[in-house]
Every structure is written in structure tokens, then in C-alpha cells.
């Protein structure tokens, strides 16, 4: 599993979620199965799940999870990729995370 977490200052969780969703939609080929699940809790949490299912000769599932939580003071983005690596448009989990980092580069990272 590949994991990345970053805490941001002055970020809007919904705007951030929309931006990451746009990255996923643009990077996932239209013929692939893509599903988004948005859950909003007390702390404005957004959870995105993407799964790619393989043909029978290549059994396996790759799942991308993006969890965005916002407690009004700071916003945290957690990204994890599990399953077989290197199969989502020939990209590894690390490369997918680079897409996410690219999408949030305009925000101020809390050190």
C-alpha cells in the first residue's frame, strides 16, 4: 500500500475534493469502472473510492482512497492506494499520489 498525508492551512475541503475528483476523472480512462462515494460527517469528511476490476485472467482490484477532513482550522488529505500496483494506466501508487500533490499545490501546507 502506498500512502500520503498532508495537512493544509486555509483550504476549503469541498473545493479540494472537487479538484481531486477532477484529477481522477481526467486520469482514468472512460472505459474503466470509476465510482465516487462522498460521505460528509460532522467534520466535513469526503471519501473517494476508485476501483479498477481486471478481466478474469488478471484477477485483482486496485483501490484508491482519498479522505479529506476539515475541522475549520485545518484540512487533512490522506491518500492510499492498495491492491496490485502499476496497472492503473501503467502508473504506480506513487505516481497517482503525485497527481494528488499536483492538485493541492496551490494550498499552503502546514508544517
Question: Locations of the language-model features?
Answer:
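Terminal, regulation- and interaction-focused segments at domain boundaries
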Residues: 1-32, 36, 109
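Ordered hydrophobic segments in well-structured contexts
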Residues: 5, 35, 46-50, 63-67
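Hydrophobic beta-strand residues in large extracellular and virion-surface proteins
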Residues: 6, 20, 68, 77-79, ...
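A structural detector for beta-sheet-dominated domains
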Residues: 9, 50-51, 69, 80, ...
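A short, structured loop/turn motif at beta-sheet edges
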Residues: 13, 39-42, 68-75
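Amphipathic, interaction-prone secondary-structure segments
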Residues: 41-59
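Beta-strand/loop substructures that line and gate deep hydrophobic ligand-binding cavities in soluble
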Residues: 56-91
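A conserved amphipathic terminal alpha-helix motif
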Residues: 84-111
